[in-house]
Amino acid sequence: MITGTVPAKLAEIIDDFQDLTEPDRLQLLLDFSRELPALPERYSDHPELLEQVVECQSPLFLTMEIGEAPGHPVHLFFSAPPEAPTTRGFAGVLLEGLDGLPAAEVLAVPDDVPDRLGLTRAITPLRMRGMSAMLGRIKRKIRESVRDEA
């Protein structure tokens, strides 16, 4: 059994996907792909600061900043090529659903969130594992950061 709480922004995105037919879900994923912002210069000029998520079928790199403010807000940054719309779309979903949330809320997100989007029949299992790996990598990096502070 997977436990955890889906933050409100991410729950709304999941509901949006679940309210659509399968072809429309794919279109919504493409919309998220197109909306994924470019990296800020501090990362685009220094790609060595990004970590590759090797489980993704297409090249995807991520990094994050964990704030000093109460709750340690998490800010996510992704880089994926335009010719990888599925990967970019998954990154866009995670960015919109999790960016700015306190670290504890991100850590509490259930691991099955990718499956809740209703794309398992339309997207290959390997690509679905890529989104799961993105979420897992985000959580691991948060845990490492919190452990380093202790």
Regions found by a protein language model. Give the residues of each.
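Extended low-complexity intrinsically disordered regions
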Residues: 3-50
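Structural motif
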Residues: 19-22, 81-86, 126
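Amphipathic alpha-helical interface surfaces
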Residues: 25, 58, 86-91, 102, ...
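Generic structural signal for hydrophobic core residues of well-folded globular domains
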Residues: 33, 97-98, 138, 142
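Structured beta-strand/loop patches that form or line metal/cofactor-binding pockets in enzymes
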Residues: 43-66
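Short connector loops at helix/strand junctions that flank enzyme active sites
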Residues: 55-59, 71-75, 88-90
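Conserved interaction-surface patches within small, structured recognition/assembly domains
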Residues: 66-85, 95-99
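C-terminal binding/interaction regions
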Residues: 82, 104-109, 113-150
